[in-house]
Amino acid sequence: NVSDFFNLFPDTVLTIVDSHPIDVAASHTKVAILKHAVTMGEQLILFSEQTQFILSSSADNLTPLTANVLVATEFESSDDAPPVGSGSSIYFLTKKGDFAGIREYITQTDVTLKDASNITIHVPRLIPSGIFKLAVSNNQDILVCLGTDNPNKLFINRWLFGTQGQKVLNSWFTFTINPNRRIKNVDFIGTDLFLVIEEDTHVTLEKLPFESDYKEDNATFEYHLDHKVTEASNNVTVAFNTTTKKTIFTVPYRLRGEMNVVGRYIASNETSTFVDLNGTTQTLKAGTIIKTTNQTDGTTSTIEANGDYRNAKVIIGEPFEMHYRFSKQRITESPQQSSAEIISSRLQLHHFYIKFEQTGFFKVEVTP
């Protein structure tokens, strides 16, 4: 009842009043068991496994007498992952045998015809089955898929709308972490994706920023490291052994691979120095990689380096690799964006030029 949320029964059965609970069925020729509901503007979209419905009202007010559940579209969906809304679209999961797909359900108030385009049509075998969570960032136009078949991998979709509301970019990529770690859940808060990650003995909460041109404080470039901490972070200690002449950095997590200790950018009123093995005090320049001397095998949380770095300003993290595969090259009939591809001839690439500026090391692999 109105203002009585836990009272699910009408006060009288002789008449229907506006304050009674709304109890309306979704009538259809198919079996329609409603699984999920997503609000979109002034509409409530209801999902069954084969049909989408809209909860609407025949009057200005939504009451037991005016409520209607109308059939909107007929698309198969999976109830393994709840649909998520972004802008005027709803993204929901579909099953395709051993693989999964994502459809974008478009709702527009000025258009009565609704549609759900397949945004994985160009990557039909990318996403495996077992997806159980969808997360979306409205600020960054990003959709993240998490499944049980690859618990250490995220499948991420990024889109961009051009003029007149036309989607000009629909790209997919993956984000993979250490195979000994399992992602249990993800969700966005603002532009940051928070991940619950399970290991053999403990669970951690980690953050993956999707902010454009993200940089550390005072830095002119981004450090491409995972699990970044500084010497000033909580639970990070820097100690010096006077016998071995080594600095011991202790971080608040177990080290799973090779770690980098890098001099970080500092404010104008700060200094960053270290003492080498000869006893000479030197300035640690930003971007300088400090050579470490111990191996990290997943059982320790310490990093050792020759010299005294107790007065150094550093950033500590795990380096990672990024792989990019170019899309299939094609020749079109005209330079227009929607022009058809010429398929009556054979395409042979003689040269392929890559323009780059102010980048780090990268390697290009060409497969004949």
How would you name each of these model-derived features?
Residues 1, 35-48, 53-54, 81-95, ...:
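Short beta-strand elements that form the blades of beta-propeller/WD-repeat-like
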Residues 29-32, 98-368:
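Beta-sheet repeat architectures centered on beta-propellers
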Residues 1-21, 55-64:
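Beta-propeller domains
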Residues 18, 57-73, 104-120:
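Sequence/structural signature of beta-propeller blade repeats across diverse families
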Residues 18-39, 71-87, 123-135, 178-184:
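Short coil-to-beta transitions that initiate beta-strands within beta-rich domains
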Residues 53-54, 59-62, 151, 201-202:
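Short, surface-exposed beta-strand-loop junctions and turns on beta-sheet-rich folds
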Residues 59-102:
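Catalytic or ion-translocation cores adjacent to nucleophile or general acid/base/metal-coordination motifs
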